[in-house]
Amino acid sequence: MKKLILAAAIALAPLASWAETKADTVRDVITQHILPRYSTLAETSDELAATAQADCSAASEALRRAYNSAFDAWIAVSHLRFGPSELNNRAFALAYWPDSRGATPKTLAALIADADPAANTPDTFAEISIAGRGFYALEFLLYDDQLSTMGSADYRCALVKAVTADIAVQSRAILDDWQHGYADTLLSPTDTSRGPQGRKRGALAGRCEMWCCR
C-alpha cells in the first residue's frame, strides 16, 4: 500500500507543479499586465475628461495631447476582450470599430444638426447610438474638417465634454470591476466554480494567461 501511495504521489507531483505554475502565470498577467494597463487607461481618461472641461475647442493642443495619451492607453488594453470590458458593451462604447458603414460620423452629424439634448447629461448620452461614443467619435470631433466646425460651437463643446466624460466613466468601470471581484474570481476559484460557470472561468483564465507575452 505504501508503495502505491508513493507511486501515486510521484505521478501527481508534475500535475501539481504544473497547476501551481499556471496559477502563478495568471497572477503575473493580472497584476503586472492587465491591472496596470487598465489603471493607466482610467487615469488618462480622467485627465482627458478634465481637460475637455477646461478647454473643449477642437483646436486645443492640450485636449489633443490628452486624447492621444488616453487613446494610446486604450490601444494597450484593446486586445483584452473578455471580462469587464465586454459587460454592457463597454469596449465598443470606447472604440466602435470596425465601422465599415461610417456610422460614427453619421451619428455625430445628426446629433450636431439637431443639437440633440442627449449630450447634456451623462445618463441620456449613454443611451445614444454606440457609434457616437468613444475615442473614434472624439477623433472626428477634434480632427474632421466638417464635424469639427459643423453647427453651434456651444453644442460641439457640450458634445466633446459628453464624449470624454463617457470615456472616463467606461474606463473607470472596467478597472473597478477588475479590482473588485473579477481578478479574484480568476485567481481564487472556489467549489462553486465547478460545472459550466467554472469551465467558463477556467477558459477565461486560460485566455488571461495567453496575453502574458503581449
Predicted segments with their positions:
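Sec-dependent N-terminal signal peptides
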Residues: L4-A13
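N-terminal signal peptide c-region/cleavage motif recognized by signal peptidases
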Residues: P14-A19
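Mature extracytoplasmic or organellar-lumen-exposed domains after removal of signal/transit peptides
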Residues: E20-R214
